Amino acid sequence: MRPIGTRTLRPRSVIAAISALLFVPILAVGAFAAAGGQSQLDGVRQATAAFHDVDAAIAAGYGPFYVCTDENGGAGAMGQHYVNGDLVGDPAIDPLHPEVLVYEPMPDGSLRLVGVEYVTLRSLWEQEFGSATPTVLGIDLKPIAAGNRYGLPDFYERHAWIWRPNPRGMFDDWNSKVSCRGNGDPA
């Protein structure tokens, strides 16, 4: 039996809509720091550095999902998500292989990598690992119920703003320093 949270990268058929998703906030910075989080973050940055080039992300199997997600209550934005369906279809969570790359649209039409998101479908996770809550980087993933804005079944998610500081916290869903205005979406 594989330890919880390890991934064997094997393709699985996944409903196209499932291959992306989302995010909801949680603050656990104290637990993260206690777990030696900075070296883990450095590893995630190294593993995702090539994806500053969106074409490299696309070549690696990531693609745009949903619209750039902006919050009207002043919380900021989640940005534009590029999802890797094969990784979403694998229930394991591997910090070095995030299921989602998060980009901020820039005024010139380019995209700037600002973070990553970890996503697993609840049904796949529980089938493989049981009812324990998945974790990544020492932080629990947040459960998101079916009936969500993305039209997905129950899933777990966690954002990590590794490329753009977030005044709301490293693992909050919303980043008040990120905007969707660069691509014409309403602010």
Model-derived segments and spans:
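Short, hydrophobic alpha-helical membrane anchors of single-pass surface/secreted proteins
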Residues: 12-16
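Bacterial N-terminal signal peptides
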Residues: 17-28
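N-terminal secretory signal peptides that target proteins for export/translocation
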Residues: 1-11
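Sec/Tat signal peptide C-region and signal peptidase I cleavage site
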Residues: 29-33
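Primary mode marks residue(s) on the alpha4-beta5-alpha5 output face of response regulator receiver
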Residues: 34-187
